[in-house]
C-alpha cells in the first residue's frame, strides 16, 4: 500500500458538563472524535450537537473549528492525528460520507450507544451513531481496519491509543495552526 494522502482525526475536550460527566467515567483526556479530509480541518464531520446551545439535539454534523459549538467553548483542548491512506481509500471514505451528507436529517445521536460502551456491549440502531462510532464506521467501510472490535465499541481514546495514527498537534483548538 502506497499512502498518497492523509485524513485527520480531531479529538476534543470542550469542558462542558456532558464532557465532564463522560470524562469522570472514561478517565480519558478527550471525549469527542471528528474526521477531516484536510489539515486545515475545514471539512470536519462527526456526530454531535446540531445546535451549539442545545446538547440534547444531536446528530450528523459538519463542524467548524472557528464557529458553532467550538466558538462557545474557547478553551477547548484537542489532539489531532494524521492517518496516511491511499487515494482509493479516500475515495471510498468520501463516498460513504456523501451518503451521510445526502440524508443528514434522518441520522440521530446514539446516546444509548454510550451506555453500550460502558457495558462492553454494542448498542446499534439504524441511522444512529455517536462520534467515535461514526469515525470508526467511515474508516471500516472504506476498508481501513484499525481495531478488532465493532465501530459501536470504539471510543475517542481508542484513536489516541492506536499506533496507526501520527500525532501532529496537541493543545488549545483555538491556537491550532495547520501551517506549523
Feature roles, as predicted:
Residues 1-180:
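Cysteine-nucleophile amide-bond enzymes
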Amino acid at each position: 500500500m502506497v499512502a498518497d494522502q492523509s485524513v485527520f482525526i480531531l479529538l476534543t475536550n470542550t469542558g462542558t458538563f456532558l464532557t465532564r460527566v463522560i470524562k469522570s467515567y472514561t478517565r480519558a483526556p478527550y471525549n469527542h472524535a471528528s474526521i477531516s479530509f484536510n489539515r486545515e480541518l475545514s471539512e470536519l464531520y462527526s456526530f454531535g450537537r446540531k445546535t451549539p446551545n442545545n446538547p440534547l439535539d444531536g446528530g450528523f454534523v459538519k463542524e467548524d473549528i472557528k464557529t458553532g459549538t467550538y466558538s462557545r467553548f474557547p478553551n477547548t483542548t484537542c489532539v489531532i492525528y494524521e492517518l496516511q491512506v491511499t487515494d482509493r481509500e479516500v475515495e471510498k471514505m468520501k463516498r460513504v460520507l456523501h451518503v451521510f451528507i445526502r440524508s443528514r436529517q434522518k441520522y440521530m445521536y446514539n446516546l444509548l450507544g454510550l451506555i453500550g460502551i460502558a457495558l462492553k456491549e454494542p448498542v446499534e440502531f439504524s441511522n444512529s451513531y455517536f462520534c467515535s462510532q461514526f469515525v470508526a464506521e467511515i474508516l471500516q467501510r472504506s476498508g481501513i481496519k484499525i481495531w478488532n472490535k465493532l465501530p459501536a465499541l470504539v471510543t475517542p481514546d481508542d484513536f489516541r491509543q492506536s499506533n496507526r495514527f501520527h500525532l501532529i498537534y496537541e493543545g488549545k483548538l483555538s491556537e491550532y495552526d495547520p501551517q506549523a
